[in-house]
């Protein structure tokens, strides 16, 4: 059965629906948010560019 969880990535809220546990989805959201924040701070880029750079990294 799918679980629904609201997560925050770089201050934006997203609703995830997946068969994974809510705690796992929160952990993934936190990881993505941390990585995007690192990219934005290091490269001085906006959220969209940070998302692309995080995805390819």
Can you annotate each of these PLM segments?
Residues 1-53:
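N-terminal globular core domains of eukaryotic regulatory proteins
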Residues 57:
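Conserved active-site motif detector
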């Amino acid at each position: 059965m799918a679980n629904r969880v609201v997560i925050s990535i770089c201050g934006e809220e997203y609703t995830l629906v997946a068969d994974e546990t809510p705690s796992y989805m929160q952990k993934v959201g936190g990881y993505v948010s941390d990585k995007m924040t690192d990219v934005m701070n290091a490269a001085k880029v906006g959220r969209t560019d940070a998302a692309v750079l995080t995805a390819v990294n």
